[in-house]
Regions:
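Intrinsically disordered, low-complexity regulatory segments enriched in Ser/Thr/Pro
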Residues: 48-74, 161-186
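Conserved binding-pocket/active-site segment within a compact domain
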Residues: 121-181
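Amphipathic, interaction-prone secondary-structure segments
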Residues: 27-55, 137-162
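Charge-rich alpha-helical segments
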Residues: 1-15, 38-40, 56, 65, ...
């Protein structure tokens, strides 16, 4: 594959190569929510099931819709290669409260929280409608807030506050506490990105 967008394609190519050597049995031992039919893994991400061929990588949406973006595909590859299922203890954490959160908080704020604030805090009703189309669960925080099943046993909440003359719009994303052990900081950033982009696609 010719590398044109290094930022996205180099990581993808790296994990695609690792994926060839992945043992399906080992992946299934770590990830009980993933299914394997001898040819494809089946992974549910934000309510949509993807079939991922192995060992020669290919991805399809089981419902026939378009395939996800390259960063999302990289996230799914990393999930199959590295993630493990960790029990959720019922607590919610901000990005900053998890390991390495303090180190990455500045890029995370710009890439995820500020983007969410100005994408959804300026169109709260559209945000609500999009989340409800996705089957998200309303939560009683912010001017609008919803809870999502991301993948496996990992949950996310997104809360938005509408701006006014005095204050700009604001947003917060909360992660189920198992993210702290089950995902690297980089993947928590990407998870926020994926959630925002998916909600936006329903607006």
């Amino acid at each position: 594959m010719q590398i044109e967008n290094h930022k996205e394609e180099v990581p993808f190519s790296y994990y695609e190569n690792l994926f060839r050597d992945l043992s399906p049995e080992a992946a299934l031992q770590r990830l009980s929510s993933v299914k394997w039919d001898g040819k494809e893994f089946y992974v549910n991400l934000l309510g949509k099931t993807y079939g991922i061929s192995h060992p020669d990588y290919a991805i399809r949406a089981v419902d026939g819709s378009k395939v996800p973006t390259l960063p999302t595909q990289t996230f799914l590859l990393r999930y199959l290669l590295e993630a493990k299922e960790v029990s959720w203890q019922g607590q919610w954490k901000t990005f900053r409260e998890m390991p390495w959160g303090e180190l990455y908080i500045k890029p995370y704020t710009g890439r995820v929280l500020t983007r969410a604030a100005f994408t959804f805090g300026t169109r709260v009703q559209k945000f609500k409608e999009a989340c409800e189309k996705m089957g998200a669960i309303p939560v009683k925080h912010g001017d609008a807030g919803y809870q999502f099943d991301l993948v496996g046993g990992y949950q996310m909440q997104i809360l938005v506050w509408e701006g006014d003359e005095e204050f700009p719009p604001n947003a917060q994303i909360l992660y189920s506490d198992n993210f702290a052990e089950g995902f690297a900081a980089e993947d928590r950033v990407v998870a926020g990105d994926i959630l925002i982009s998916t909600i936006k696609s329903f607006m």
